[in-house]
Amino acid sequence: MAKVSLEKLLRIPPSLTQSISQTKVDYLNLGHSGLRVSRPILGGLHLGSRKWLPWVLDEEKALPILKAAYDLGVNTWDTANVYSNGESERIIAKALSKYKIPRNKVVLMTKCYRVMSDPERFDPGSGVTMHHELADYSKDYVNQWGLSRRALFSAVEASLDRLNTSYIDVLQIHRFDHTVPPEETMSALNDLIRAGMVRYIGASSMWTFQFATLQHIAETKGLTKFISMQNHYNLIYREEEREMNQYCKMTGVGLIPWGPLASGRLARRPTQEEGSLRASCSAHGSLYESDDYNVDRIIQRVAEIAEKRGWPMSHVSLAWLNRRVTAPIIGFGSVGRIEEALAARGKELSRDEEQYLEELYVPQRIQGHS
């Protein structure tokens, strides 16, 4: 009887087999932490209100994308309090509720630092976040942004309310705050973790010396250190390779880059029409100069390898990137885009192909730092 029971326990349960077969992603440890995140991570910049940016998906279109992502195994969702002035966080909470997704089965990542629309005059389309340097001159916005103890606790409390959750898995500081002593920032972040409001902390685009300073303060004072860096990194913007990527690799910080496909440029030929509303809007005033000769030549080489291998261009770009990071953050405009990205799973380029893609790169001005 005992032998029969043991044999039954040793069999893989059908429910586990089914779950594995439905999972179309890999899960990797985020830096030296024990937290495992999906590759890719879903980016929440695309979800919110079209009043904020014309290519953002309103709730009606955003909810099915979150459901599809979850069903396929993309259970790590990144957002920020300023995305559509909080609407992105609210829609994520709506998805968890509407589709009865257990909170413990998703990893929620959000960010704070920038100023948001005043709740008393709330406007999801407000561009106040682009003018945080003026906030401290306003009676309504003073102390409502940045990385002070006051601002951090207020931001996290508000994000918890919008996300309808008791904790944030990874709280990321959106940029470095020059106006606050770094010791105050790291102490407050540590206290947020001790209070149970946050599980882990991460950071986003900044200079390496700034990030190293924050990590050094945490280490010397026995405070919680950052486990992730969300920086700007892709085949046509590789300035982070100079210091930040190497520092993170050396110190066990996971890289989760934004803009992995350069607003879609690395997923289509230079002469091809924009594949999304965001791409067409980004053609003017984009981070990526549309007439950069070397950039276009790199993209053309992505197209050559894609044609040779019979892959979409996005798979070539992601195959190059995935060897160098933990997980890229991708904003999906449709369920089809999710499926395309997940089909890149396990694909690798040869060293010769990687060198062919890399050799045309020339240094660029630093983009995305505060």
Swiss-Prot record:
Q: What does this protein do?
A: Aldo-keto reductase; part of the gene cluster that mediates the biosynthesis of destruxins, insecticidal cyclic hexadepsipeptides which induce flaccid paralysis and visceral muscle contraction in insects through targeting the calcium channels and vacuolar-type ATPases. The aldo-keto reductase dtxS3 converts alpha-ketoisocaproic acid from deaminated leucine into alpha-hydroxyisocaproic acid (HIC), which is the first substrate for destruxin assembly by dtxS1.
Q: What is this protein called?
A: Aldo-keto reductase dtxS3
What is this enzyme's EC?
Answer: 1.1.1.-
Provide the family line: Belongs to the aldo/keto reductase family.
Identify the residues that bind NADP(+): 78, 204-205, 230, 259-269, 333-341
**Keywords recorded for this protein, A-Z:** NADP, Oxidoreductase
Q: What positions constitute the catalytic site?
A: 83 (proton donor)
Following inactivation of the gene, the phenotype reported is: Impairs the production of destruxins.
